[in-house]
From Swiss-Prot:
Active-site feature positions: 49 (nucleophile)
Annotated family: Belongs to the pseudouridine synthase TruB family. Type 1 subfamily.
CDD domains: PseudoU_synth_EcTruB
Key words, A-Z: Isomerase, tRNA processing
Lineage, opening ranks: Bacteria, Pseudomonadati, Pseudomonadota, Alphaproteobacteria, Hyphomicrobiales
Tagged with keyword Membrane: no
Residue segments, region Disordered: 87-107
Protein name per the record: tRNA pseudouridine synthase B
Length: 324
C-alpha cells in the first residue's frame, strides 16, 4: 500500500480575515496567505470577485472544517451603482448592453428600496460561478452562450443609501444572506428605475461573525513576515540557516472557535477534554450547561476542541480538532 506523503508546511490553525485588494482573485488570495504563513492547508469562506475589495475570511489548517459556518453567515457590502448602462457582467468589467439617458432622483431610489428588502427573488449574473449542467455559468458566458439561470430566493435584511455623489452614481450598504448577488441587485434596480445600472465599486465589510476590525491588509502581513533563509548562487540554502520566527505573523490569526459564535459553547475540564479527544461523550456540568442542542461546541482552556450535539445533558462529539 502506498504511503501518504508528508504534508508540507506548518500545522497552524485559525482564521486570517484578509482585506483583499481589488484585482486579486479569491483563489490567488488563498494561495498568497497559505504561502505567507507556510500553512499545510488553507481555504476561503465565500468567493469575492476580483473587482471587489474587502473581507475574505481565509481558514488555515483545522479551521477549514468550520468554513461552512462562516459561509452561512450574514454579509455586509458597500457598493456604488452607476446609472445609465447595463453591462454584460453587471459590473465595470463587462461591455455595455443597454443604455439610457435617464437618471433617477434620490427620492425615486429611496422609494424603491422597500421592494428589495426581505425575501426577494433574483437571477444570478450570466458571469457567475453558478453551475449549469455541470459547467460554470461564467465559462459558458465567455464562450458566447446565453444560459438560463434559475431564479433563487435570497434575504435582504437591510438596504440603504449611504451616498449620492452625483446624478450618475448612488452609494449603498446592504446586509444580506448567503447567495445574494450584489451585481444582480444593481441590475434589477436599474431596470425597475427605467435607467439601467451596473456595479462600479464593491467592498465587503463584514462576514458574520467577523467585522471590519478583524481585517488585516497584505501590507500588514508582509511587514511581519519572516524572510526566507538566504541562498547561494546555485539556489541552495546557506547553512546554518536561521530559524524563521513566525510569532508576529501568527499573532494576527484569529482562533478557530471564533467562527462558531452561532453555536452554544461549553468549557470542559482537562479530564473531560481528554475523553472528547478520544471520541467519547461527556456529561456537561454546571448550572448553565444546556441539556439539549442539535449542534454545539466544547472548548478547553479557551480553545475549540470539538463540534457535536447535546442530548440529555451529554455532549457527543462529531468532529474533534487536534489543535484543541
Amino acid at each position: 500500500m502506498a504511503r501518504r506523503g508528508k504534508k508540507k508546511g506548518r500545522p497552524i490553525s485559525g482564521w486570517v480575515i484578509f482585506d483583499k485588494p481589488k484585482g486579486m482573485g479569491s483563489t490567488e488570495a488563498v494561495s498568497k496567505i497559505k504561502w505567507l504563513f507556510s500553512a499545510e492547508k488553507a481555504g476561503h469562506a465565500g468567493t469575492l470577485d476580483p473587482l471587489a475589495s474587502g473581507m475574505l475570511p481565509i481558514a488555515l489548517g483545522e479551521a477549514t472544517k468550520t468554513v461552512p459556518y462562516v459561509m452561512d453567515g450574514t454579509k455586509v457590502y458597500r457598493f456604488t451603482v452607476t446609472w445609465g448602462e447595463e453591462r454584460s457582467t453587471d459590473d465595470l468589467e463587462g461591455q455595455p448592453t443597454k443604455t439610457s439617458d435617464k437618471r433617477p432622483s434620490r427620492e425615486e431610489v429611496e422609494a424603491l428600496l422597500p421592494d428589495y428588502t426581505g425575501v426577494i427573488s433574483q437571477v444570478p449574473p450570466q458571469f457567475s460561478a453558478i453551475k449549469i449542467d455541470g459547467e460554470r455559468a461564467y465559462d459558458l458566458a465567455r464562450e458566447g452562450e446565453t444560459v438560463e439561470i434559475p431564479t433563487r430566493e435570497v434575504e435582504i435584511d437591510r438596504l440603504e443609501i449611504v451616498g449620492f455623489p452625483d446624478a450618475d452614481r448612488t452609494e449603498f450598504e446592504v446586509e444580506c444572506s448567503k447567495g445574494t448577488y450584489v451585481r444582480s441587485l444593481a441590475r434589477d434596480m436599474g431596470r425597475d428605475l427605467g435607467c439601467y445600472g451596473h456595479i462600479s465599486d464593491l467592498r465587503r465589510v463584514e462576514v458574520a461573525p467577523f467585522t471590519d476590525e478583524d481585517m488585516v491588509t497584505l501590507a500588514k502581513l508582509e511587514a511581519v513576515w519572516p524572510p526566507l533563509p538566504p541562498k547561494d548562487e546555485d539556489g541552495n540554502v546557506i547553512e546554518p540557516a536561521p530559524r524563521r520566527d513566525f510569532s508576529a505573523l501568527d499573532a494576527l490569526v484569529i482562533d478557530t472557535g471564533a467562527a462558531l459564535d452561532c453555536l452554544p459553547q461549553v468549557p470542559l475540564s482537562d479530564d473531560q477534554a481528554q475523553r472528547v479527544r478520544l471520541g467519547n461523550p461527556v456529561i456537561l456540568r454546571g448550572r448553565d450547561a444546556p441539556l439539549e442542542a442539535d449542534e454545539a461546541c466544547v472548548t478547553t482552556r479557551g480553545k475549540l476542541l470539538a463540534i457535536g450535539y447535546i442530548e440529555h445533558g451529554q455532549f457527543k462529539p462529531k468532529r474533534v480538532f487536534t489543535a484543541g
